[in-house]
Amino acid sequence: MLYLRDFMNEVQAFPPTFFVRGIPIYGNAILAPMDGYSDWPFRSLCRALGSAMSYTEFVKVEKILSRSKEPAKRLYYEEAERPVTFQIYGDDPDLILKAALTVQELNP
């Protein structure tokens, strides 16, 4: 059985297709952000089928800062999914900054 981490080890034997801010991207397909669909199982399946990069579902900054369990579920990713991009949103720049610094600890 081929696991996602094994697949990524094989892919990374080739040079990256392009870079995003110095992060190597291996492949041509990028999974578009889709709220309500881009959960961890779906992203893992797409990764196994050739997606080179993916996005989490949207997470409201107030929920991140409240430390509720919902954001952790929406931002969960496996190491083999890298690179993965977190999507956060809100209307208060100060809260957006605080939430961004909070999720940065997860090393997306």
What residues fall within each predicted segment?
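Glycine-rich, positively charged N-terminal anion/phosphate-binding segment
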Residues: 7-19, 34-108
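N-terminal, post-signal-peptide segments of secreted/periplasmic proteins
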Residues: 22-23
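An anion-binding catalytic pocket shared by soluble metabolic enzymes
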Residues: 31
